[in-house]
Amino acid sequence: MPQSAARGSAAWALVITGAASFMAALDNLVVTTALPSIREDLGGALEDLEWTVNAYTLTFAVLLMFGAALGDRFGRRRLFLTGLTIFTGASAAAALSPGIDALIAARAVQGVGAAIMMPLALTLLTAAVPAERRGAALGIFGAITGLAVASGPLVGGSLTEHFSWDWIFWLNVPIGLALLPLARLRLKESHGPGARLDVPGTVLISAGLFGIVYALVNANADGWTSATVLLGLFAGTALLVAFVFHGLRRPDAMLPMRLFASRAFTGINAASLLMFLGMFGSIFLLSQFLQGVLGYSPTEAGVRMLPWTAMPLLVSPIAGVVSDRIGGRPVVATGLALQAIGLGWFALVIEPGVAYSAQLPALIISGIGMGMYFAPAASLVMSSVRPAEQGIASGANNALREVGGALGVAILGAVFAAQGGYESGDAFVDGTVPALWIGSGAVALAALTALLIPGRRARGTAPAGEGAKEAKEYEPAAA
């Protein structure tokens, strides 16, 4: 292929995959600043609002690696188009939802589409870009995804205020319809290794996580000792235990448990899950606090959250450079500690009528902490496994982040419902403060977990005993 044609193909691949990933990443948090308007328009209790977030994150998380495997087997472009079609159609269905149950169902289908689309977008881009320009392309791709996450609350707030909440979903439809013919024409079909599809593993983890999250979300409404809640907790836990044994026995499992033999891999993934648990649950409540208690408009609420959500765009590149010099472990641990301090600061200062100036330090500290986490955490994940396993490791980490987010909304929502409610500003604060302390504690535990990640061995040294030869060829996770 001529050089100019190759450049054009790579540019088109970046535009198409970047736009698709922007939509999928945006929909993680775009709904948060629209929640008060959705509640006012469609009704629904706290648990219904939690499901508008969790229906997306759960299906996204549990099907992420399965979607990548489908693409490898049946064609990456073909499945990318399938995921994009599902996501676009579900976005239209969400916008047209006549009630809260229909919206939750549409959000779940959105998550299915995103889970197929997202991993294949990265694979298609990598294949389309020449090796000498791949780093720059992947950097732009990562920046686009980060911008989508950061701008989610602002975009959601602005569309809700100036149009209505359904426009946060209508936004995806013209973009998706434009991308479908472009992807068909401009992306090349490719296949991966013909690995077996782990359908049993996907069913086990999907049902297990659904049972636990369902129980947590409905515990306060139904009672912690109700049959449905107890069944959800026990059945969900049993299914997740079965998923672990399945991963131990099947070498081609969706999430091979052999990866967790690496203390570095286990540590960074545990820290990631806890970090997203605290962050997602806190954003879920604080975005409603800014509007429902302090009286900010949706746009004003989104703007006021930018010091937190947008700070990683500035801090992450610097954190990446620093981690290359001193190792990822201290940078990640420091970032998580700052995030925990920021959430604790929120818990100390929020009250009905609290000034924004009192909240601003917490927002900035949390944003800096989040930015210090992202780039070094990705590096720690990749360096904790062998090169041949990096694709699986990255997918597992992304899935566990989404699981953490879903659990965070469920757990912090349960604490909020037990201690407060929507009856008044005081009631909302009564529920939010203990929930924020739980979120802060989860992120603090993540910081301690990050400190336990093993340090880097001196280059060329190997552990004694079996596998020493292999260790010489592979350097474990950075300090």
Residue ranges of each PLM-predicted region?
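12-transmembrane solute porter fold
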Residues: A10-L26, V31-T33, L46, T52, ...
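Glycine-rich, flexible loop/turn motifs
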Residues: A25, F60, V112-A114, T145, ...
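Interfacial helix-loop-helix linkers and transmembrane-helix boundary segments
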Residues: G71-R78, R134-A136, H191-V199, A253-P256, ...
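Conserved aromatic/hydrophobic "specificity hotspots" at molecular recognition or selectivity sites
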Residues: W165-L204, L248-P251
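Phenylalanine-glycine-rich, low-complexity intrinsically disordered regions
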Residues: L187-P193, S206-V229, V244-L248
